Amino acid sequence: KYAKIKNIDKNLVARLELDELKLSSITKTIIEITKLRDPIGVILDKWKRPNGLKIKKISIPIGVIGVIYESRPNVTVDLSCLCFKSGNSVILKGGSEAFFTNKIFVKLFRKSLKANKVNMNYVQFIERKDRKVVSSLLKDMRNYIDVMIPRGGKNLVKKVKELCNVPVIGHLEGICHTFIDKKVNTKMARNVVLNAKMRNVSICGATETLLIHKDCPKKKINLILNELKNNNCLIYADNKVRKIFSGKLKKATNKDWRKEYLDSKISVKIVKNVNEAVQHINKFGTMHTDSIITNNSVNANYFVRNVKSSIVMHNTSTQFADGGELGFGGEVGISTNKLPPRGPVGLNQLVSFKYHVAGNGQIRK
């Protein structure tokens, strides 16, 4: 209510808002995480050497995880649960927008730890709001924090990646694409595109650019674009699309291919084939999530193999780019790093490992 009175951006308000449905979703996530298998102490691999040495690769906690995040109060709960379940301590620095909500969630979590005779400091919350705290976390905590996870807008993530002197797990932007091939099921293409863009426009898995094969029937293109327009989506299209479409569309510029709108807006472009679609995605995308809609298995396989993103999809919505939806039981974020972890970082990705080497007196020659 206060945010609306102060005329704060509607997308930010949507992320801050906690209604009964969102609280129910948070509770459901907690329950799901408690049911997941303990990821610590798992034998990931084992083998025996010719000299009799027995080697095991065993999962262990990372250690202390620092998290700097904005807006979404559910992140406080997700991160606390996932870090604790994976045997890690977590230091939370939430945004000022949700300060009091975050504080209450952490208080409840720490109270629960104490009631179960567990060290409350597994979950810590930084209550100071000044920006010097963030700089200190990034520059001065190398001996205390093992990995940093930023959750928020491009500027926050960029700052963390530039200033932090410990490994960072995260992504700058979610410029996600959906490519419609020439042979598709019309109803499926229409439903998937609408969901990928409009289900929730403010999440990083929302499709921001729609690519369409040049031989896709004009009738199908008009049907799909009209579905978006009828749902109040503003379309920025290249000249080829504007000639095909029966109504009026905004003209796209080269800048639109690099935009993460996080709004009811989408850029649309005609491409020659699946190869050009892949080239466009690898040039303008952010290695987050990209999907192909096609009945052609050869094109689908080519797309999946050659798109460089951490999540590639076939005949489904990019909005499934979420740890909970992929069965991870929640996530601390999505990593677009080329080194692991990649994609949704859930419980099983919040671990490191060590090698246990057992012998019976062997010495190296």
List the predicted regions and their residue ranges.
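N-terminal Rossmann-like NAD(P)+-binding subdomain of aldehyde/semialdehyde dehydrogenases
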Residues: K1-I55
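General structural feature for long, well-ordered alpha-helical segments within catalytic domains
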Residues: K22, I26-T29, P61, T101, ...
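Rossmann-like NAD(P) dinucleotide-binding subdomain of oxidoreductase/dehydrogenase enzymes
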Residues: K35, I43-K183, K187
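Structural motif
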Residues: G63-V67, L82, N88-V90, N121-Q124, ...
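ALDH superfamily catalytic-core signature
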Residues: S71-N74, D78-S89, L108, A115, ...
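Conserved C-terminal structural/oligomerization subdomain of aldehyde/semialdehyde dehydrogenase
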Residues: T253-K365
